[in-house]
């Protein structure tokens, strides 16, 4: 195992197309980090640079006490798990898991021992004699993880490994990856566009956007205190409600742009200090914090639709130019055209600068 250090890491093509813009992060020995963001944000490129599959334009990547910028992938002491499994169809599970060690000249007894140990961890022992065509998608992905485990690397790299699985298998494999990390405690970097994977697997999340690390932090901190409008809108399902508008001079109300209502916001942390009054802001509040509740400031939301999500409902309406969602208990299903008393708890309100997109307060 080893720590992983990224210092000022940049990537560009032909000096013109800039893909990554100075990524700085220190990943502790044994830490599980998730790179999450939309397509084209640079997360997979960064993973490939750590693996040695892409060159580093500028900056430094170090694994343990070695700078690895110019090292070949085979010399970096890493193991990768890919989206497409990449198993040899003519080999058995055991042969697939041990093949990387075989071509490195590792003796047979060591290979057999490592394969047996990994198979036990991943509950693959009954499948060792089977070939990939005889396995389910989840079993194939476990074989791919087993192939990585037997290498006993300093760092695991996961490139969207669950993307090809159905919803039920993704849940199962998330749990297996959590258990695997708890058992092995190997430094891990995991790439995904799926925020549920990011929030459930990570010890820290790196939210990527257009080649920048928008925010780095524990999942709960990123969720509860997003650093930018982008993070607020990307992390969370459904996304945070974000409204452009103007904060009154006395800081008591926020008028939503596009003819929306004046919302009660008095008492929100930072108003009159970091959050200047009498100017434009972007106001954010999560749907689950708008569930009607007694003793909390409220505003009327005309309901135009309601989605049944199983355990709860999601009511939709509009304030001015903005679509608004409110999470409701399973028993509350307002009809179209009804008025919903949406809560606006002061301590749950977020303000962002409309120009920079950065959080205030």
Curated annotation (Swiss-Prot):
Reaction equations catalysed: sn-glycerol 3-phosphate(out) + ATP + H2O = sn-glycerol 3-phosphate(in) + ADP + phosphate + H(+)
Binding site for ATP: 37-44
Domain of life, per lineage: Bacteria
SMART domains linked to this entry: AAA
One Gene Ontology term of the molecular function aspect: ATP hydrolysis activity
ABC transporter domain boundaries: 4-235
Subcellular location, record wording: Cell inner membrane
One GO CC term on file: ATP-binding cassette (ABC) transporter complex, substrate-binding subunit-containing
Entry's Gene Ontology BP terms: carbohydrate transport; glycerophosphodiester transmembrane transport
InterPro entries: AAA+_ATPase, ABC_transporter-like_ATP-bd, ABC_transporter-like_CS, ABC_transpr_MalK-like, ABC_transpr_MalK/UgpC-like, Mo/tungstate-bd_C_term_dom, NA-bd_OB-fold, OB_MalK-like
Keywords: ATP-binding, Cell inner membrane, Cell membrane, Membrane, Nucleotide-binding, Sugar transport, Translocase, Transport
Chief localisation class: membrane
Signal peptide per UniProt: none
Membrane topology summary: Peripheral membrane protein
Enzyme Commission no: 7.6.2.10
PANTHER family: MALTODEXTRIN IMPORT ATP-BINDING PROTEIN MSMX, SN-GLYCEROL-3-PHOSPHATE IMPORT ATP-BINDING PROTEIN UGPC
Subunit and partners: The complex is composed of two ATP-binding proteins (UgpC), two transmembrane proteins (UgpA and UgpE) and a solute-binding protein (UgpB).
Function as written in the Swiss-Prot or TrEMBL entry: Part of the ABC transporter complex UgpBAEC involved in sn-glycerol-3-phosphate (G3P) import. Responsible for energy coupling to the transport system.
Family designation: Belongs to the ABC transporter superfamily. sn-glycerol-3-phosphate importer (TC 3.A.1.1.3) family.
Protein name: sn-glycerol-3-phosphate import ATP-binding protein UgpC
Primary gene name: ugpC
């Amino acid at each position: 195992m080893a720590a992983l250090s990224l210092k000022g890491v940049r990537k560009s093509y032909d000096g013109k197309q800039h893909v990554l813009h100075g990524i700085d992060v220190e990943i502790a020995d044994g830490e599980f980090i998730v790179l999450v963001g939309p397509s084209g944000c640079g997360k997979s490129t960064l993973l490939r640079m750590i693996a040695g599959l892409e060159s580093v334009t500028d900056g430094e990547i170090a694994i343990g006490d070695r700078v690895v910028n110019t090292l070949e992938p085979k010399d970096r002491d890493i193991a990768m798990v890919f989206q497409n499994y990449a198993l040899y169809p003519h080999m058995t599970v055991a042969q697939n898991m041990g093949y990387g060690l075989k071509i490195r000249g590792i003796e047979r007894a060591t290979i057999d021992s490592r394969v047996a140990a990994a198979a036990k961890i991943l509950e693959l022992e009954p499948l060792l004699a089977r070939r990939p065509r005889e396995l389910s998608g989840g079993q194939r992905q476990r074989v791919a993880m087993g192939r990585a485990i037997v290498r006993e690397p300093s760092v695991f790299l996961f490139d969207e490994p669950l993307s090809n699985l159905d919803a039920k298998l993704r849940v199962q494999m998330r749990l297996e990856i959590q258990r695997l990390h708890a058992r092995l405690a190997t430094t891990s970097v995991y790439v995904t566009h799926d925020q549920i994977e990011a929030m459930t697997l990570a010890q820290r999340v790196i939210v990527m956007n257009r080649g920048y690390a928008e925010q780095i932090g524990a999942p709960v901190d990123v969720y509860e205190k997003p650093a930018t409008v982008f993070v607020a809108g990307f992390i969370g399902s459904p996304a945070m409600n974000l409204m452009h508008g103007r904060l009154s001079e006395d800081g008591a109300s926020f008028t939503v742009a596009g003819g929306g209502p004046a919302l009660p916001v008095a008492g929100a942390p930072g108003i009159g200090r970091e959050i200047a009054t009498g100017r434009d802001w972007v106001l954010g509040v999560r749907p689950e914090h708008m569930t009607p509740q007694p003793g909390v400031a409220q505003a009327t939301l005309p309901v135009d639709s309601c989605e049944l999500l199983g355990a709860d409902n999601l009511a939709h309406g509009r304030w001015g130019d903005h679509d608004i969602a409110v999470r409701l208990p399973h028993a509350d299903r307002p009809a179209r055209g009804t008025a919903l008393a949406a809560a606006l708890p002061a301590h749950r309100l977020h303000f962002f600068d409309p120009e920079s997109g950065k959080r205030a307060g």
